[in-house]
């Protein structure tokens, strides 16, 4: 199973660098940035040994382009168990349950991480197959 990390409108270059570093530490390199902030020296410094993850990242204008080839789209959220006009929930799994479900799987997974201030929108969560 191939995992693509998708950062949706990241606000802070340091966070992009930190995600790239964490990705490399766990053996991932496929990063897609949806309408990102500028990534300059600080973001690259935070990436440390994972600078090539940032340099190889694909930058896209919309979420649809970022997830178009994915067989499974997984959204992340800190809000659980509510359905309101502002918070839409699709099937929810814990990180452990997701890992168990993905073991031995084939295809491509897009793992969406939302904005630092507002997370993923209701519309973006609706595009997900699973929420963690």
What are these language model-derived features?
Residues 1-132:
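Post-transcriptional modification and biogenesis factors for structured RNAs
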